[in-house]
A protein has these predicted regions:
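Pepsin/retropepsin-fold aspartyl endopeptidases
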Residues: 1-126
Length: 126
């Protein structure tokens, strides 16, 4: 999968599926400095992905500050050819100072054994 470099950040697209409903995010940050994957709550509601009564809620912290998120298993996360099932994601408001549809973190990249080729700007299988 091609990686787009914009404003000195790496961007990809991602698709998530929950109970047969699928949504695609076009502006997803590829972030090896993020331990987890996070998607915006207002978009996840489009596929009825909301917190369960016992979904863990906690604060994550990044460059933009702290943000409350909930964690829940999603049926499928896909980034290009990389696909993982029954994967734990984080969902939060994601109100940042720049347009962003989500973050693919190190947990996903390690789980699918992805390699980032910065010379060719590609996400590839190892």
């Amino acid at each position: 999968m091609k990686i787009l470099i914009q404003d000195e950040l790496a961007w990809v697209s991602a698709t998530v599926t929950f109970q047969g409903r699928t949504i695609t995010f076009e502006n997803v940050l590829l972030d090896t400095g993020s331990s987890g994957c996070i998607f915006p709550a207002h978009r996840m509601e489009e596929i009825d992905f909301t917190p369960e009564p016992l979904s863990p809620v906690f604060n994550i912290q990044g460059v933009g500050g702290k943000e409350p998120v909930f964690m829940r298993l999603i049926d499928v996360v896909m980034v290009g050819e990389f696909r993982i099932e029954n994967f734990m994601i984080e969902v939060g408001a994601m109100k940042y100072d720049f347009p962003i549809d989500g973050i693919i973190g190190l947990d996903f990249l390690l789980a699918v054994k992805a390699s980032i080729d910065l010379d060719k700007l590609e996400l590839r299988s190892v």
